[in-house]
């Protein structure tokens, strides 16, 4: 902190311990803070979590992705009509690759990701955030939705775009195969 008090480090360790955090996955720019956290854990007599430090996610080859620089947050993506499951799937594949029978697969359920995730498969090189890849993954999730679920998710976007009486079931049946992001409506 700017007043040189380690309140953030202290609060972070206490919060993680109280939440039962066993693994901390974070950017490698935080590698130097791990010894401070470990000293706090040891001082309290608490078990130190496993740390996994990852290369940063990059906007391009020279700039880190950062919400301070106007890059989209999770909430921004939700407001644009990205599905949470698609964003999680996309982020899981940034700087990590599945192995074995899954190494060619790109679309995963959360249960599949939990089952096959291995920190040893995290790349040491920075990953570049590819918005077109995110759109493609989101499109696959949209197309896999049951029609009723697509309609429920699409309705607010239809409300803001269509101002006349229309058969929404027919509209949704035509939109779902073409829509990559709900904001496309």
Please place each PLM-identified region on the residue numbering.
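Active-site beta-loop-alpha substructure in enzyme catalytic cores
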Residues: 9
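Conserved nucleotide- and phosphate/pyrophosphate-binding catalytic cores
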Residues: 5, 14-185
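Short, Gly/Ser/Thr-enriched beta-strand-loop segments that form substrate-interacting elements
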Residues: 1
């Amino acid at each position: 902190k700017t007043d040189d008090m380690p309140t953030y480090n202290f609060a972070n360790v206490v919060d993680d311990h109280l939440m039962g955090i066993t693994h901390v996955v974070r950017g490698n720019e935080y590698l130097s803070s791990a010894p401070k956290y470990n000293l706090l854990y040891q001082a309290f007599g608490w078990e130190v979590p496993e740390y996994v430090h990852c290369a940063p996610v990059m906007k391009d080859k020279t700039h880190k992705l950062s919400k301070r620089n106007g890059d989209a947050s999770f909430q921004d993506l939700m407001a644009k009509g990205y599905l949470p499951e698609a964003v999680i799937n996309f982020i899981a594949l940034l700087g990590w690759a599945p192995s074995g029978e899954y190494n060619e697969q790109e679309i995963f359920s959360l249960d599949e990701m939990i089952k096959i995730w291995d920190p040893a498969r995290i790349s040491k090189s920075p990953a570049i955030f590819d918005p077109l890849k995110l759109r493609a993954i989101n499109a696959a999730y949209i197309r896999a939705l049951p029609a009723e679920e697509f309609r429920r998710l699409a309705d607010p976007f239809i409300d803001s775009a269509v101002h006349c009486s229309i058969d929404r079931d027919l509209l949704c049946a035509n939109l779902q195969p073409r829509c990559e992001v709900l904001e496309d409506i």
